[in-house]
Curated annotation (Swiss-Prot):
Record-linked PANTHER family: NAD KINASE
Bias kind Polar residues: ranges: 197-214
E.C. code: 2.7.1.-
Biased composition (Basic and acidic residues): 88-98
Xref: SUPFAM superfamilies: NAD kinase/diacylglycerol kinase-like
Residue ranges with Basic residues bias: 516-529
Disordered, as annotated region: 1-33, 71-98, 197-220, 516-537
Family (UniProt): Belongs to the NAD kinase family.
Name assigned to this protein: Uncharacterized kinase C1B1.02c
Catalytic EC class: transferase
InterPro entries linked to this entry: ATP-NAD_kinase_N, ATP-NAD_kinase_PpnK-typ_C, NAD/diacylglycerol_kinase_sf, NADK
Length: 537
């Protein structure tokens, strides 16, 4: 096709775009988002991927008078031979044309059905970050100060009142008994009295009583809806804990022996979803699966999570349960340090072939990994990878594992992925048994948006799982959008150092286990004392 003819087709597509928008606005049933829901925050966040250029008027430069969407004309699908269809991954232009028919610009809206108003575009402009520096030296100094601020925030010690504690344990006898023992200790022997260094901080919080009353009224209304026959006992703001245990444990004898009973309540998944701000902290007892369950229960806001291990320490459950009295006493009185672990926000987009658009079926937050595999199919699957709407490659394998830094020591390392410290915000992509020997795991920054598409000419469907939960089938044309979640997982750690992660790496995975060349414990303790004395000086 000549360049002149292609330009005319683009102009024709731009002219007919507004007419298609007007027709689609009258058909509310085919829109890719709910008009009754306020989509402005979502549009403001996701519209940066659109190809838009504006022509502001001389009078109002902040408002856009005309918007033009630049897009390639819809391509016509040409029949291809069976060999070319199976080896279409080498034709990047064909993949780009195919993605033009199935890609979207906003997670809850399709490009052909998006009506962008001047106010929303102006809001998008105002959210941009502008930095001014007189020279390169000032810019370097600014970057250094930002890194120093991030380092201090990661090492900051927090201290606030804990009153309502949610307990999560594994479904085994030892974990349940340990959880009940910990709950009884909190109810009987522990009384929260903040130290003098934290009295000023606690007294300066004038909104604490208001927030308590709001959360109590929220919980009261929820309990009346879910448990209409139960008598609601209001919470009195004293130095006593209110313990929430799982409702499935209510009939056990060890749970019925807890006292006082007015401070023992039971939680459900609905309560965690609808009232996430009700709980001050979450305590998990068991292994790493208990901490993953806490992340799955709180899809948005997550309270600080303390993870105790009943057996061998894991990468999430690093606190030994045998020392829970000492650990909790230090945390509640002297404060604690939180490691904000990155989570993914995964959006499932269903392809509507009748209207050549997509609809968002659901969103899930994952702490470990998103797994896409071939499921029960006996042959490998084809997946198209796009980063920021740019075609990267077509992967032919048994599946792909998209992991967070926290999940780099789980399924990802078994798939050949790299180990990544949880303090590094990154997206790890590892193929599962790839057909091409040249495919290597890749690490992307968390600022990018990854899209994994099941091609329209794929041989079979794919299956996906989110942290081992909620297994879903992906049809032809469907895809998943992966981006960094706005709600990280706050994991309570004992110190600001990364000593725990490296110790567990050596203990659990036997990382670089060559005993003849490892330093002795005496040498390591001497180095630790030297570093501590240097910091104190």
């Amino acid at each position: 096709m000549e360049p002149g003819s292609k330009l005319s087709e683009d102009e024709t597509f731009s002219q007919t775009f507004n007419e298609e928008e007007q027709e689609d606005s009258r058909n509310k049933d085919i829109l890719a988002f709910d008009p009754s829901v306020d989509n402005e925050p979502l549009l403001t966040k996701k519209l940066s991927s659109l190809s838009i250029y504006s022509e502001p008027s001389p009078d109002e430069a902040s408002n856009l008078q005309e918007l033009k969407f630049v897009s390639s004309p819809p391509s016509v699908r040409v029949p291809r031979s069976r060999r070319n269809r199976r080896n279409s991954r080498v034709d990047s232009e064909a993949r780009k044309r195919q993605f033009d028919r199935v890609k979207h610009s906003v997670s809850n809206s399709c490009k052909l059905h998006l009506s962008l108003q001047g106010q929303e575009a102006a809001q998008l402009r105002s959210d941009s970050l502008y930095l001014e520096a007189s020279d390169k030296r000032d810019l370097t100094s600014l970057v250094t100060r930002v890194k120093e601020l991030a380092r201090k925030l990661s090492a900051a010690r927090l201290a606030f009142r804990f009153r309502k504690v949610l307990l999560i344990c594994n479904d085994n006898k030892e974990s349940i008994e340990r959880s009940v023992e910990l709950a009884q200790w909190l109810l009987d022997t522990f009384s929260f009295t903040p130290s003098s260094s934290h009295n000023n901080m606690a007294s300066s919080n004038t909104q604490s009583n208001t927030q308590l009353s709001e959360m109590e009224s929220e919980e009261k209304s929820f309990n009346k809806d879910v448990y209409p026959n139960d008598e609601y006992t209001p919470f009195t703001p004293k130095n006593q804990f209110v313990i929430y245990l799982e409702d499935t444990l209510a009939s056990l004898d060890v749970v019925e022996s807890l006292s006082p009973k007015k401070n023992v309540r039971f939680w459900t998944s609905e309560l965690c979803t609808q009232c996430p701000n009700l709980f001050d902290c979450v305590i998990t007892v068991g292994d790493d699966s208990a901490a993953l369950r806490a992340s799955w229960l709180f899809q948005d806001v997550v309270p600080p999570v303390l993870s105790f291990s009943t057996a061998k320490a894991g990468f999430l459950s690093i606190l030994p349960i045998a020392e829970y009295t000492k650990t909790l006493d230090l945390i509640f009185h002297r404060g604690f340090t939180v490691n904000l672990r990155m989570r993914f926000q995964c959006s499932i987009m269903r392809y509507v072939g009748e209207h050549s658009t997509h609809i968002c079926e659901g969103q899930y937050s994952v702490l470990n990994e998103l797994l896409i595999d071939r499921g029960p199919n006996p042959f490998m699957i084809s997946l198209d990878l796009y980063v920021e709407n740019e075609y990267i490659t077509t992967l032919q394998s048994d599946g792909v594992c998209v992991s967070t830094p926290t999940g780099s020591t789980a399924y990802s390392v078994a798939a050949g992925g790299s180990l990544c410290h949880p303090g590094i915000p990154a997206i790890l992509i590892s193929a599962i048994c790839p057909h091409s020997l040249s495919f290597r795991p890749i690490i992307l920054p968390d600022s990018m948006t990854l899209r994994i598409v099941v091609p329209l000419d794929a041989r079979s469907n794919a299956w996906c799982a989110f942290d081992g939960h909620h297994r879903i089938e992906l049809g032809l044309g469907d895809y998943i959008s992966i981006s960094a979640s706005s709600f990280p997982f706050p994991s309570v750690i004992r110190s600001k150092y990364s000593k725990d992660w490296f110790d567990i790496l050596r203990q659990t995975l036997n990382w670089n286990d060559r005993k003849g060349r490892q330093r002795s414990s005496r040498y390591k303790s001497h180095v630790h004392k030297t570093n501590t004395s240097e910091e104190q000086n």
